[in-house]
């Protein structure tokens, strides 16, 4: 019996001795610095709920409530003596980039119906193909971009752009703007081009944004804009130059397409030749299995995006279309040339009928 009592006492003593060891496992840790503490408690520590709530009201992220941890570390780390250790300010929400905008400078020489349609076209285009935020990476383009528009019947009324004329995206190296000098004859004759040109120049801004203003090739740049111009006309006005097969198209478009890579060939009337090449590329992609919509998306959107990553346009071409530029040029041999039936055209021409897009093709389906 005595032996049993001794054993029980021994067990009690051992248990009592083990108790401090167990309690030490839950003892609050002493942190050497806030950096050390924040690894465990990323928002810091509050001594109680009241201190936590006060911290949140003051703009801090909600700290962990732990009286033990606070008591262990407050003498060194609670520098403000406010019941908070290593409090952290709430992260500022990431500011969302403002949509790219245009500043419209419309001269009074333009009639009210043109101004109304101009605003409608700009609204439609903004919904169909919004300007990518990538344009903020182009150093000489700022938002809002100025648009200067006037009737050619008057001299350029904007002294800030001396010498400006015609329709273009122009700049001085530090800033970029859009010029829309609308021919008086187009306004008088109700020529659709007075509206279509807006889509053409807008698309150039879209191209600049998607490609980060990468230098490319004229026929894809201007040809793409011409195609968008005519697709817009087809979709919103019910007719376009596709109905007339983009005539005239110089035979050089299929005989020596390389000359359309740069401006100044003298054989690209109204960019019809460049547009033909873009349409022929779309047809080639369809023959390889792409849908019509997907082929035009690849040309008008994807190639521009690839150009932002690969500045060599011929390499970007291969990456986007899975063929070389030379292979595409060889495919143009399938399109015959012929003498023009128009007396005022002295050169051979190409019939664009085989490459004209369908009437059901829309900008919505391409850019959605």
Descriptions of predicted regions:
Residues 171-247:
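Zinc-dependent metallopeptidase catalytic helix centered on the HExxH motif
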Residues 212-277, 283-290, 304-324, 328-363:
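Acidic/His/Gly-enriched intrinsically disordered linker/tail segments
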Residues 95-112, 180:
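Acidic/histidine-rich, surface-exposed loop or edge segments in extracytoplasmic proteins
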Residues 75-79, 84, 193-201:
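Short alpha-helical catalytic segment bearing the HExxH-like zincin motif
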Residues 28-36, 40-56, 114-177:
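Auxiliary, metal-adjacent structural segments of Zn-dependent hydrolase domains
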Residues 22-77, 87-94:
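Calcium-binding acidic motifs and repeat modules
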Residues 1-4:
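Positively charged n-region of N-terminal signal peptides that target proteins for export
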Residues 14-23:
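C-terminal segment of classical bacterial N-terminal signal peptides
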């Amino acid at each position: 019996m005595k032996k049993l009592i001794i054993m029980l006492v021994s067990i009690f003593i051992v248990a009592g001795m083990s108790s401090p060891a167990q309690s030490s496992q839950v003892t609050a840790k002493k942190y050497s610095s806030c950096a050390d503490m924040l690894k465990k408690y990323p928002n810091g520590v509050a001594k109680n709920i009241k201190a936590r709530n006060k911290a949140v009201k003051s703009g801090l992220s909600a700290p962990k409530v732990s009286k033990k941890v606070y008591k262990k570390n407050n003498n060194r780390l609670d520098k403000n003596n406010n019941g908070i250790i290593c409090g952290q300010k709430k992260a500022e929400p990431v500011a969302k980039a403002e949509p790219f905008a245009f500043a419209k400078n419309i001269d009074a020489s333009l009639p009210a119906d043109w101004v109304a349609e101009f605003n409608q076209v700009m609204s439609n285009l903004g919904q169909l193909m919004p300007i990518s935020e990538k344009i903020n990476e182009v150093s000489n383009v700022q938002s809002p971009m100025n648009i200067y528009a006037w009737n050619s019947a008057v001299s350029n009324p904007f002294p800030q752009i001396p010498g400006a004329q015609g329709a273009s995206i122009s700049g001085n190296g530090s800033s970029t703007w859009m010029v829309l000098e609308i021919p008086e004859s187009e306004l008088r004759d109700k020529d659709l081009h007075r509206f279509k040109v807006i889509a053409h120049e807008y698309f150039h801004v879209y191209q600049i944004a998607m490609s980060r203003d990468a230098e490319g090739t004229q026929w894809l740049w201007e040809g793409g804009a011409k195609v968008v111009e005519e697709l817009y006309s087809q979709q919103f006005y019910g007719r376009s130059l596709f109905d007339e097969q983009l005539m005239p198209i110089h035979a050089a478009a299929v005989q020596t397409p390389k000359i359309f890579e740069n401006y100044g060939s003298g054989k690209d009337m109204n960019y019809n030749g460049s547009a033909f090449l873009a349409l022929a590329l779309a047809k080639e992609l369809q023959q390889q299995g792409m849908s019509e919509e997907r082929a035009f998306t690849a040309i008008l959107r994807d190639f521009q995006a690839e150009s932002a990553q690969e500045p060599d346009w011929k390499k970007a071409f291969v990456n986007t279309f899975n063929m070389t530029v030379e292979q595409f040029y060889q495919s143009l041999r399938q399109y015959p040339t012929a003498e023009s039936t128009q007396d005022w055209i002295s050169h051979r021409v190409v019939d664009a009928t085989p490459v004209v897009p369908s009437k059901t093709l829309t900008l919505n389906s391409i850019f959605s």
